[in-house]
């Protein structure tokens, strides 16, 4: 550290200078560290960096726009390419020529359209006869099934209502099936009872004839095999 000038009042040693001199003498701080601490950063450096960042962002935005324009030009290159434009022009010219020919033959075409086609026979090559036979079979089948298909198409709007009616009919059918099963069970039970009664009738008749012969009075109990007998002598 340079010695202070005793005649310069600004160079007179102060407390901070003495402390720094002590640190330098002890080796805790060197001159390079002091020189680095003396460097000051301008307050306009951040503004300069901000301006640079803004310029870079603007340049990036401009490049992105150029890239989008290039992509759009690439996508539309096939449309505006002279080769494809020439093909389209040729196609349009052909259609125009065809329409001109149709307009020129308008009268003959109208006469041909008014004339019934049943009076003309279209020639078909022999190699296509079998295909025509198959085609006619398909046409006949289609005509036969046309009415069914049309009826199906007409019923499409009423499909929900028809399904609802079908579900109701199925529910009623289930109820009828259940009632029929119960009725069949009752009929079987009744038949079984009738068979039992039929088998008991001869026994009852035999008992009545026996009681009648021996003057025995039987109380009127319907269809029972147990007879409570009361004789005249027991009274």
Swiss-Prot record:
It comes from the Eukaryota. Residues 51-115 form a coiled coil. This is HAUS augmin-like complex subunit 2. One of its GO terms (biological process) is centrosome cycle. Keywords: Cell cycle, Cell division, Coiled coil, Cytoplasm, Cytoskeleton, Microtubule, Mitosis. It is found in: Cytoplasm, Cytoskeleton, Microtubule organizing center, Centrosome; Cytoplasm, Cytoskeleton, Spindle. Pfam families: HAUS2 (PF15003). The lineage of its organism: Eukaryota, Metazoa, Chordata, Craniata, Vertebrata. One of its GO terms (cellular component) is centrosome. Component of the HAUS augmin-like complex. The complex interacts with the gamma-tubulin ring complex and this interaction is required for spindle assembly. Interacts with EML3 (phosphorylated at 'Thr-881'). The keyword Calcium does not apply. Belongs to the HAUS2 family. The gene is HAUS2. Contributes to mitotic spindle assembly, maintenance of centrosome integrity and completion of cytokinesis as part of the HAUS augmin-like complex.
């Amino acid at each position: 550290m340079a010695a202070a000038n005793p005649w310069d009042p600004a160079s007179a040693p102060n407390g901070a200078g003495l402390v720094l001199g002590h640190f330098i003498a002890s080796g805790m701080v060197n001159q390079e560290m002091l020189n680095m601490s003396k460097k000051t950063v301008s307050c306009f450096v951040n503004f300069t960096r901000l301006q640079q960042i803004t310029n870079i962002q603007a340049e990036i935005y401009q490049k992105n726009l150029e890239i989008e324009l290039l992509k759009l030009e690439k996508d539309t290159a096939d449309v505006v390419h002279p080769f494809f434009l020439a093909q389209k022009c040729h196609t349009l010219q052909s259609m125009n020529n065809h329409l001109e020919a149709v307009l020129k033959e308008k009268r003959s075409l109208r006469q041909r359209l008014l004339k019934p086609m049943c009076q003309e026979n279209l020639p078909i090559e022999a190699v296509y006869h079998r295909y025509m036979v198959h085609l006619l079979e398909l046409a006949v089948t289609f005509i036969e099934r046309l009415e069914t298909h049309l009826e199906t198409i007409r019923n499409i709007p009423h499909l929900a209502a028809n399904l609802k009616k079908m579900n109701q009919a199925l529910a009623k059918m289930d109820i009828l099936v259940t009632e029929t099963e119960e009725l069949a069970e009752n009929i079987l039970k009744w038949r079984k009872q009738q068979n039992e009664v039929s088998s008991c009738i001869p026994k009852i008749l035999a008992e009545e004839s026996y009681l009648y012969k021996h003057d025995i009075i039987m109380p009127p109990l319907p269809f029972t095999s147990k007879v409570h007998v009361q004789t005249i002598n027991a009274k």
